Amino acid sequence: MDLDINFVRSQFPAFSENRLKGKAFFENAGGSYACGQVINRLNRFYKEKKVQPYGAFEASISGGNEMDEARVGLARYLGVKDCEVSFGPSTTQNTYVLAQAFAEWLVPGNAIIVTNQDHEANTGSWRRLCNRGVNVREWQVNKETGELNLEDLENLLDDNVKLVCFPHCSNIVAHINPVKDIVSRVHSAGGYVCVDGVSYAPHGLPNVEDLGADIYLFSSYKTYGPHQGIMVIKEELAELLPNQGH
């Protein structure tokens, strides 16, 4: 089946603007235009339902229901439980909060692995855990290809490693990492995985359950939605980590 590009473009009000007609935008890294369905829903929310949700009056009930619909729908797309989907201001901020939770859960001597193929969002917050007594190890790219080799990961894994953070797709060399293979190796060593899907999600909707990732992060404002970060975290792992909210 051929993709009807004209139909696709018609779903985005931005492209009805004269100054944008006939143009293609490759700026997902910074954000994408929202489709009409998203804009309409946000307009309805701000006009009719911007109240405390789950209350006893109509606007509050309806607003809460729409929030639940968004979570349930997204969970279905991603192949996970509703309770495993969280919303935040951005992937960078979600990762920061997540790192603070791990900082309280990890003990001195525990190790985490980060890569030098990652965007800063999935490496900076984790690297700073070294100030809390956590051993931070770097899974380095092959200098010739820019890719991450699984053999190098194996050399870093041991019983002390509790978390491995890496990108689904590099935003520098565009290499798609073999997430399922990496997850299998890390789980066999007793660790968890945190996958940054920001550069992958706009091009291939991930089935997180199939990938096996314990944590999967991406940004809805880079996938034609509102300015939010999406975090999937497996229920059993979420229950282990100290709560960072109120």
Where are these regions (language model features)?
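Pyridoxal 5′-phosphate
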Residues: 1-246
